[in-house]
Amino acid sequence: MAASLHIILDTDPGIDDAAAIAAALFAPELDLQLMTTVAGNVSVEKTTRNGLQLLHFWDADVPLAQGAATPLLRPLRDAAYVHGESGMEGYDFVDHQRQPLAKPAFIAIRDVLMNAPEPMTLVAIGPLTNIALLLMHYPECRFNIHRLVIMGGSAGRGNFTPNAEFNIAVDPEAAAHVFRSGIEIVMCGLDVTNQAVLTPEYLATLPALNKTGGMLHALFSHYRSGSMQSGLRMHDLCAIAWLVRPELFTLQSCFVAVETQGQYTAGTTVVDIEGRLGQPANAQVALALDVDGFRQWVAEVFACAP
């Protein structure tokens, strides 16, 4: 099958990001044109190093641009306590000479968008700082964005604070700007990503699958060793899965606002499922997932990798 959907991936690798990057590279329906990094799971220097390591591991001819080192207005709160000090503990990647592009991520994204023959799809699986910077500096670029698919947010409980999901909570101001931008947004938040669980039985097959499976198994074992026995949530993979298999997801058009001021609620995505606020919808929010179909797709795409 010829690749039909050209995408830009903004990411903060991060162990679960590695699985999403694999899918973006090897799902036959996708053509990854640019990868950009942002501070999130760990510092941007580390997410950039990790992204370059992954591209070298797969010998992927994809340019990478380093992005924002800090949120727009706040100090960075990372997740090194989950992903390890380097962000991808658990696998020994070989040395390489790859370097990022000599321009920041938001400019690299602008350049790819403006040179594309038609509007492109952006996929953001980390904090939305780079996307906000793009829209703030080059608001005209929104007409060159077909759609933004994000892993972030929640219509219910959070995973970083009681109400806020990590990617949004790291940079609420950036997320608020993006949701107000008028671009088409598909939000794959915790409502579906908490359902996207790979079984211990499947995880145990990864080392024998291919070199990608071996690498991911090593990362996953370090990332969530207990989950290797109970099942592992694949948060970031959901954004890639929606691009390829949207029929697996149940979406609802909603107005989504991002809280930036609350002492206890900053970073919360207020998802107006019942339309109580009387505001026009600004996002398609994924609320349910065909879990068996998702697992089948993951197995298929990982088997396509080297």
From Swiss-Prot:
GO terms for biological process: purine nucleobase metabolic process; purine nucleoside catabolic process; pyrimidine nucleobase metabolic process. HAMAP family: Nucleosid_hydro_RihC. Hydrolyzes both purine and pyrimidine ribonucleosides with a broad-substrate specificity. Keywords: Glycosidase, Hydrolase. Disulfide bonds: none annotated. GO terms for molecular function: purine nucleosidase activity. It comes from the Bacteria. The active site is at H235. This is Non-specific ribonucleoside hydrolase RihC. The keyword Magnesium does not apply. InterPro entries: Inosine/uridine_hydrolase_dom, IUNH, Nucleosid_hydro_RihC_nonspecif, Ribo_hydro-like. Belongs to the IUNH family. RihC subfamily. GO terms for cellular component: cytosol. Its EC number is 3.2.-.-.
